[in-house]
Swiss-Prot record:
SMART domains: WD40. This is POC1 centriolar protein homolog B. The lineage of its organism: Eukaryota, Metazoa, Chordata, Craniata, Vertebrata. Signal peptide: none annotated. Residues 449-469 form a coiled coil. WD repeats lie at residues 16-55, 58-97, 100-139, 142-181, 183-223, 226-265, 268-307. It is found in: Cytoplasm, Cytoskeleton, Microtubule organizing center, Centrosome, Centriole; Cytoplasm, Cytoskeleton, Cilium basal body; Cytoplasm, Cytoskeleton, Spindle pole. Phosphorylated in mitotic cells that may be mediated by CDK1. InterPro entries: G-protein_beta_WD-40_rep, WD40/YVTN_repeat-like_dom_sf, WD40_repeat_CS, WD40_repeat_dom_sf, WD40_rpt, WDR55_POC1. It comes from the Eukaryota.
Amino acid sequence: MASGPEDPILERYFKGHKAAITSADFSPNCKQIATASWDTFLMLWSLKPHARAYRYVGHKDVVTSLQFSPQGNLLASASRDKTVRLWVLDRKGKSSEFKAHTAPVRSVDFSADGQFLVTASEDKSIKVWSMYRQRFLYSLYRHTHWVRCAKFSPDGRLIVSCSEDKTIKIWDTTSKQCVNNFSDSVGFANFVDFSPNGTCIASAGSDHAVRIWDIRMNRLLQHYQVHSCGVNCLSFHPSGNSLVTASSDGTVKILDLVEGRLIYTLQGHTGPVFTVSFSKDGELFTSGGADAQVLVWRTSFNQVHYRDPSKRNLKRLHLEASPHLLDIYPRTPHGHEDKRETIEINPKLEVMDLHSSSPPVVDVLSFDSTTVTDSTCRAVPGKGEDICRYFLNPLLMPECSSTIMKKKPEDVGDPPSENQRSVPLAVADALEHIMEQLNILTQSVSIVEQRLSLTEDKLKDCLENQQKLFSVIQQKS
């Protein structure tokens, strides 16, 4: 694959988090970016000019991972507070809280059909949840140290996980057994993911290396030694032909997987880079790190007519003869010092629209409509429908901020000045949240009254039946 006709360019950058950014993901429609941070908040950024950002408040410790549901109407997040949350992305702050892990949760990932969620934790376990039923399903135990990441395969039949025990494991979701194991004596993988076609996995190593494994042949295909510090995250381009990586050396690198070489080194962050993610259409990718900035990069990869890497092995692509290790290069670690293009970026100089870098932020305070645990295996206190109905009908939840804004006309365009607002925005949001809580309280009281009435009716029936029984006994005696 040749490099694209144009170099990657920095298109936008956002500031709003108060600490390092740990995870980022594009919405399926590519109109929003969600980010997680050490500041315990999630933020939702719109790629529309002058649109407001939303800060979701609910976790009590560092948010370690997040991901949009495939329908785009929900957002899952994991935290060091040992919980997983499932958010409805509106201004009401509805969320389900999943409690099952006994240690910080490091990773969340939806299956491609959105039916399941997999979580990985420092308690050495992997847990799978049903989104339809809002309940815990099962755990996977084989790792002997903290599990840092777990991902579904594109077809949902497999799960890949990596741990500080220096192993990468492949799990069958049907048998719930470990069916494959990759080990490395040098370091452990911080992050792992499937290629878009599901035949390979890529790992981001603490030993500074990026590795590509063929899970059909159980062999290492490519080994890139291009970073000078640990690799924290990676993301496949939707075509599967390239890979973007984030490292503690402060750089973002783009690898050509067909030719097996490094094509770009991007230097835009000050400090370690912790997360990177391609958009679903492959036109953008975002990065975040210790500098608390979200950088949005535009690529021209979609303009290039890629060759499918697997077509190099067409003669071997059948069950009797899978692709051979020697068919794919490089076969040994390469420093890739030659033909490397380094692009240094200063966000404040490269992005002219500085006003959009720090958009107005609306705080969304969470209230828990559902709590799900592995012990109850069901939602309590019985309001799973609050979140589940959004899962069943994505049309109930807007997929992008532009449709959210339709409910609030004042949210469109520039934020109104203080003399144009009779009530400050923060106060209005707080009042709206209080009203929502009062509505919930009213509904709860109504439900309690109904249950009391039902109990009284049942008690009355019991007394009548008891009286009849006594009458029958007296007649017989």
